[in-house]
Amino acid sequence: MTSATRSQVLSLYMRVFRIARGWQSTLPQDTESERRYIVQEAQTLFRQNQQLTDHTSIKKCIDECEARIEIGLHYRNPYPRPLYLPIMGLATQKGRKLKAQQRMRKQAKPVYLQSHDEDS
């Protein structure tokens, strides 16, 4: 990781904590739990991706973080937006059709959910 990339990642990490510190929920009783969620989510995802060394995968994670920040601030919602599967995305198939479904699901996954598993 270059020093420029490292400083960009660290500034994003600190930006997330600054956002969490000043976060105001639309419902006042949920403010504290949403602040905790923002901090825990940032810690989890940054630790999960700290071993990355490939520049393109690091760039994807940076783009994901920036997208999550912008979406969260715009909608005033710290939780990831739901993922809608394409048509025929859940039908059970076998062989080539199954591979096509898996490819459709992967292509339909937005940039702000790349670090999340399909099961979670």
UniProtKB/Swiss-Prot annotation:
InterPro entries: Complex1_LYR_dom, Complex1_LYR_LYRM1, LYRM1. It holds the Pfam family Complex1_LYR. It comes from the Eukaryota. GO terms for cellular component: mitochondrion. Residues 101-120 are annotated as: Disordered. PANTHER family: LYR MOTIF-CONTAINING PROTEIN 1. Belongs to the complex I LYR family. This is LYR motif-containing protein 1.
